Amino acid sequence: MIKILIVNMILLITQQLSAKDYDVRDFGAVGDGIFVNSNIIQHAIDYINAAGGGRLVFYPGTYVTGSFYLKSNVTLHIEQGATLLGSTNPWDYVKDPHVGWKSMIFAVKQDNIGISGKGIINGRGFTTANNMVKYIQKGLFDDPLKLDRPNETNRPENIYFRECNNVVIRDITLKDPASWNQTYDQCKNLLVDNIFVDSKSYWNNDGIDVVDCDGVVIKNSYFDTADDAICFKSHDANAICQNVVVDNCTGRSSANGLKFGTASRGGFRNFKITNLTIYDTFRSAITFAAVDGGLIENIVVDGLRSVNTGNVLFLRIGNRWSSGKTPSLQNVTIKNVYAEVPYAKPDAGYNYEGPVEDNPRNISPASIIGLPNMRIKNITLENIEMVYPGRSDTLYAKVGLTSKELDAIPEMEKSYPEFSQFKELPAWGMYIRHADDIHFKNVTFRALEQDYRPAVVMDDVKGASFRGVSFSEPNAQGKNQIFKYKSSGINIE
């Protein structure tokens, strides 16, 4: 799968490099940071498309624009020193009727398109969103202002591509959207390579959203985001996000580093994630959320370094919007991981940092949590070291190991999935519930200070193996670090 994807992407890049160049200024564009160029850019794209294709080149300057549509066989090439600057007038953006979102750059049902160059796409999202709030308050725009902000579909993204084939996004900087930064929805053959994403200007600022796509490579890229950094979604129960490679990427988030979900109607299949670095992240380094009736299967994570991140791994089956379908999460291998979980809030001081919780909990463990009739199956954790702070305080929060306490942990099957949703959990390293065939190989759990909880708690687990698993905790000689409850087929070597 990976070799085929890479060959296809090389062919796409070669095709783009051989395209004819057109200077956007020859069509009347003005890069003075004032003139709004939307209509001129659209005319240039239409012309190049009709002429058989080519590159629309933006030379150094600041080109203000609202919405426009990229078309087949056209690449936007933004030179170093050039900026596509989003208009701060919300009326300069359209909501596409097929997509249902606003964006600066749209493409719908187009082939052989791309964005390249060392330049910048800057949505100026904070100002644009606040201007929209003013229009809403004047009654000029219809929006309920839920949570005191416009709905995310009414705020412009930087990029939204829907049902496009052969897409290349290379070398650019994407910053300051008013909503999600870039979405690729039901696209085939997508390459994202060597991009820099700064997405901390407003709420819901995901770094990249890949929705129900087939054949995706994301590599050599950096994401600094207020919301999920790298996010895979499945909006269509009859579609699936599949055949995806993520390699050599770095993420920083006030939500999750890399996430499957939350929208998970169809599901996710055949992913390989390698050499991923996550730091200063509020929630989980990687979240797997099968909560809307879809599947998550055949996933390999090989190489994760997670530092100053609130949680390492969160694997969850829920029953939120399943509509009669049964979600599944199975056949996941996670290996070659080093992770440090801090005691303090990891994203303190960042723009739009994660919320301060109003219910107390000690540091949460990594977790694998299914439901009694929807079990997580066949998970392998190999060559992993997880370092926790310890320091749990029973006066702050406590869940012990009695039947009454363990049974009182809620299922929360309809709740939004988040590693901290259960509040206090009875383990400091790993909590596993309603799962089958969970395998640990060469895994180290390390607590820097003493914790009242054992490292691992299994509740209703059928089949688990521990090979080469070690525990380090001060003043814990003789402590039973693996606790089994209502579990069977547990092999500890």
What positions do the PLM features span?
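Sec-dependent signal peptide recognition
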Residues: 1-8
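Extracellular/periplasmic carbohydrate-active domains that bind, remodel
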Residues: 11-12, 16-493
